[in-house]
């Protein structure tokens, strides 16, 4: 990967404003900016950065130069975080344009000039100078037709797309490989664990690169996608706030798909304001997304209005002990249990009504997992395998140009088989899930598919919806580890994760508020209340 280099003159100007750090004992031996005019790039939220931009204390161009310098120091050298696949070669030019607009009094929105990174499965227009590949060399053979729908909305609001983040290749649907590894990006690793991935610093997936980039101070915020846990899990492991929106409330058009039944597009950032400010721009109707119309009555133009530091008052929170708080059945690290329980008690003391436990009917049905292979061992894996075959073909034929004959899932499989040196390096073989999906027939005439879809719907109605009705709940509260993200997948529901603590190797962990479908306002309220009363997230010790 070639990251665009800072121009020497720009770097000289930058160092006049920035404090630098020689992190040779922790990361890169290359000096890189730590702060700009009092804004610490490692800890500052998008809200902090936006305020500094509005105050005229920093410019978007200065931010871009600083972020690129930080990426160059520790992404492919230094700590080798491997969170970024490409940096936009046009970023400095666009930043200068946005600064000129601001100087002329033309500020598009609260995120005007804010540099963000987006997962490499979001289409970005070729004018930005970046590829969209889902981490795969196969998609490097073609170009995106234009911006994904949500990218177009964010750019119109003045957001600056700084780069494309690493991910599980094809967002984890390819087969059994480690989290946040892709052929193009390599193995992403946590900035929080000394020794990185080899020492247990698994960043989570599939949006691991997005999360690590924000935690390392490479961008103000990031976009991820979530089919089951792909925003919630990596955000948690990077000590970030993250929002997995209800499926359909944000558009998926122009995003490399896994499953139209479950996919969603969302945000990871360092504060809840950051989440709400980006989400409210993304949450608009898209006539090309089949799931968008159903969400229209529930959309709000302003989601920052739901930030409420006293939001726990009179909030009814359900605790589904089985199976999601059971460390034995769910396999999450026992070292985090005490922190989870202490957090729960503090939330109770802040005025929330804690209903503990709430009993999930047929809890055993929730103890499935996506094994990442050919097996269709649950309703979820059945639906996803049928979906990816047809959804990928639709994406390739409607959202790409110059496809070089790459029009079906089978074409991707064939490319990968023909290029094992690129796609199957030692330890990262193979593509069993894609192969199994490609062998399936049409989903519209498949009894297996529609039966699985019906079963998923019943699991939601008789499980998640039952809990909300039976116990008169506002949200559920669950650990982010241990499979709780399937509540969002099955319910197509919003999940908001908050940072809680750090385990014995300093890997962060979190908790998540789960709302009813389209009830993002209550989830944001709960996240905001949490943020107001709990300690600020710690920055990665490898970079501090």
Which residues fall in each region the model found?
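Glycine-rich, small-residue loops and helix-cap segments
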Residues: 56, 113, 119, 156, ...
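Flexible glycine/proline-enriched surface loops and loop-helix/loop-strand junctions
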Residues: 46-47, 133-137, 194-199, 206, ...
